[in-house]
Design a protein with these regions (language model features):
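A general structural signal marking secondary-structure boundaries and capping sites
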Residues: 30, 57-61, 176
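A short helix-loop-beta-strand connector motif used in the catalytic cores of GNAT acetyltransferases and
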Residues: 54-69
Length: 201
């Protein structure tokens, strides 16, 4: 399976049948069901979801949704998922969702690296215009990361009820031009190794 995009710490691939067992395990993880997927699928539903992801990803262009699996650059083990949703090929926009499913890699550089690698793929390979992201107000790590590079478009107050609390939903966006400015601003600091290795241009 070829790499869709490559970063320093991870690379992205379209999931294949070889990834089915891993995806099935993630779909049945209680933490991910509660925090990410928002559902508790039984085994058959989970199997159908995995099959749909693999079949949908066989189509290179034109799909409304694309699922990418992130793998560790050195260990070649699956560490997370990137989901591109509501893809508007005409207006060149989409929504991005990501998760570190492998518990051992939820800390460290993997989350930011997955997002950076995905944005490079979206803007430099697919030539999209704008990306939207959504973050709950209790996800401080993702909020900090979003505020670092993206613009907050608005807040959906008291959007969902979780563990006896109402959570707000923050909407962020970044367009291709702003991403270019972000890369240029940081090319001599924390992105210097990405540029040196030709991972970003």
């Amino acid at each position: 399976m070829f790499n869709v995009a490559t970063g320093l710490f991870c690379y992205l691939q379209r999931p294949s049948i070889e990834d089915a067992d891993t995806l099935l395990e993630w779909l049945q993880d209680p933490l991910l069901q509660d925090k990410v997927f928002g559902m508790e699928p039984d085994l058959q539903q989970a199997q159908e979801t995995v099959q749909h992801w693999i079949e949908e990803n066989a189509e290179l262009f034109g799909a409304e949704n694309i699922v990418l699996i992130a793998k560790h650059s050195k260990k070649d083990i699956p560490i997370g998922l990137v989901m591109l949703k509501n893809i508007d090929w005409r207006n060149r926009s989409l929504d991005i969702h990501y998760l570190i499913a492998n518990e051992a890699h939820r800390n460290g550089p993997y989350g930011p690296e997955m997002v950076l690698t995905t944005l490079v793929y979206i803007f430099q390979s697919l030539n999209f215009h704008k990306v939207y992201g959504y973050v709950y107000n209790n996800n401080l790590a993702s909020l900090n990361m979003a505020n670092f590079a993206a613009k907050e478009e608005g807040i959906l107050k008291n959007y969902t009820y979780v563990n006896n609390n109402w959570l707000d939903y923050h909407l962020y966006s970044i367009n291709q031009q702003d991403f270019k400015v972000f890369l240029d601003k940081n090319k001599n600091t924390f992105l210097r190794h990405h540029f040196k290795k030709g991972l970003i241009h």
